[in-house]
From Swiss-Prot:
Function according to Swiss-Prot or TrEMBL: Transfers a succinyl group from succinyl-CoA to L-homoserine, forming succinyl-L-homoserine.
CDD domains: GATase1_HTS
Cited SUPFAM superfamilies: Class I glutamine amidotransferase-like
Cellular localisation: Cytoplasm
Stored Pfam families: HTS
Molecular function via GO: homoserine O-acetyltransferase activity; homoserine O-succinyltransferase activity
EC number from the UniProt entry: 2.3.1.46
Name under which the protein is recorded: Homoserine O-succinyltransferase
Main location: cytoplasm
Protein family according to the UniProt entry: Belongs to the MetA family.
Organism domain of life: Bacteria
Gene3D superfamilies to which the protein is assigned, alphabetical: 3.40.50.880
Length: 309
C-alpha cells in the first residue's frame, strides 16, 4: 500500500532507498480514490527512526494510506529536532473533530514508570476515550498495550523483574483468524519490555481473543471480536539493529544488561544481527489494514459506523 506522506518528510528518501513505495501528497492528489486515514501516536523518543519503521510496514498494498503523525507531549524533545516536530506533527486539538480509519499507538520506554507518573498520562486517556467514537480500529504496540489494558479494562500494571529483550518464538492459537492469516504456525518476533502480559490475566480480565502466544504463555497478539482494538506486545516494527542499539546503550550506561536472547549470532554481541521477523511484521500490519480497517470502515468518515458485514 503506497503510504501518503508530506513531500518533505525525511522518511520519503529513507524508504525510497529501500524500494518502498512512498507516494507524496502532491502525487496522491491526482488519484481519484479515498485513501485510508491512519493516525500514528508516536510515543518513542527517536521519532524519526520510529516513523521509518512503521511507515515501512504500512506500505505493502495497492491502496493509499494517508498518514497523520500525532504528539501529545509538549515537553522539549532531546532526540528529535523541534523543527521536525513542528513541521510534521499535529497536536490533539488539531484533529479531535476528525475521524480516522486507523490509529496506531506506539510503545514508549516507560516500563518502570507508574502510570500516574507518566507526564502525559491524562492525554493518553483522552486519546483512547476519543478513539472510541472517532477511529474504526486501533492497534496498540508494546507499552501502549499495557496502558490501554489499564485504561480500558482496569488491568493493574504488571512488571517483570528483569527486562525481556530478544527474539522469541510464538505460536498461533487460531489458524483461521483474520489477523493471523498467512502466518506460519510458529514465528519469531522481537521483544524489549519490562511489561508482563500473562495470557491467563488477559482471559480473566477481558473478553479479548488471544491469537498468538509466546512459548512461555505470554499473550503476544490479541484483539476484540468486533476488530475495533488490537494489541501486539512485541516490536514487529523493529529494524535489525534496534535491539543492538538498545543493548549497547545500556552497556555504556553501566546497567549490565543481559545479551538479547536469540538475537546475535552465537550469542556474541560482536556479531551482526539479522532480522528474522521481517515477513511476520509485514504480514501483521497488512492484515490489520485489510481486515480490521479497510473492510469495516465506512466510506464516508463523517459517519462513523464500522460494520462487520
Amino acid at each position: 500500500m503506497p503510504i501518503r506522506v508530506p513531500d518533505e518528510l525525511p522518511a520519503v528518501n529513507f524508504l525510497r532507498e529501500e524500494n518502498v513505495f512512498v507516494m507524496t501528497t502532491s502525487r496522491a492528489s491526482g488519484q481519484e480514490i479515498r485513501p485510508l486515514k491512519v493516525l500514528i501516536l508516536n510515543l518513542m523518543p527517536k521519532k524519526i527512526e520510529t516513523e521509518n519503521q512503521f511507515l515501512r510496514l504500512l506500505s505493502n498494498s495497492p491502496l493509499q494510506v494517508d498518514i497523520q503523525l500525532l504528539r501529545i507531549d509538549s515537553r522539549e524533545s532531546r532526540n528529535t529536532p523541534a523543527e521536525h516536530l513542528n513541521n510534521f506533527y499535529c497536536n490533539f486539538e488539531d484533529i479531535q473533530e476528525q475521524n480516522f480509519d486507523g490509529l496506531i499507538v506506539t510503545g514508549a520506554p516507560l516500563g518502570l514508570v507508574e502510570f500516574n507518573d507518566v507526564a502525559y498520562w491524562p492525554q493518553i486517556k483522552q486519546v483512547l476515550e476519543w478513539s472510541k467514537d472517532h477511529v474504526t480500529s486501533t492497534l496498540f504496540v508494546c507499552w501502549a498495550v499495557q496502558a490501554a489494558l489499564n485504561i480500558l479494562y482496569g488491568i493493574p500494571k504488571q512488571t517483570r523483574t528483569d527486562k525481556l529483550s530478544g527474539v522469541y518464538e510464538h505460536h498461533i492459537l487460531h489458524p483461521h483468524a483474520l489477523l493471523t492469516r498467512g502466518f506460519d504456525d510458529s514465528f519469531l518476533a522481537p521483544h524489549s519490555r519490562y511489561a508482563d502480559f500473562p495470557a491467563a490475566l488477559i482471559r480473566d480480565y477481558t473478553d479479548l481473543e488471544i491469537l498468538a502466544e509466546t512459548e512461555e504463555g505470554d499473550a503476544y497478539l490479541f484483539a476484540s471480536k468486533d476488530k475495533r482494538i488490537a494489541f501486539v506486545t512485541g516490536h514487529p516494527e523493529y529494524d535489525a539493529q534496534t535491539l543492538a542499539q538498545e543493548y549497547f546503550r545500556d552497556v555504556e550506561a553501566g546497567l549490565d544488561p543481559e545479551v538479547p536472547y536469540n538475537y546475535f549470532p552465537h550469542n556474541d554481541p560482536q556479531n551482526t544481527p539479522r532480522a528474522s521477523w521481517r515477513s511476520h511484521g509485514n504480514l501483521l500490519f497488512t492484515n490489520w489494514l485489510n481486515y480490521y480497517v479497510y473492510q469495516i470502515t465506512p466510506y464516508d468518515l463523517r459517519h462513523m459506523n464500522p460494520t462487520l458485514d
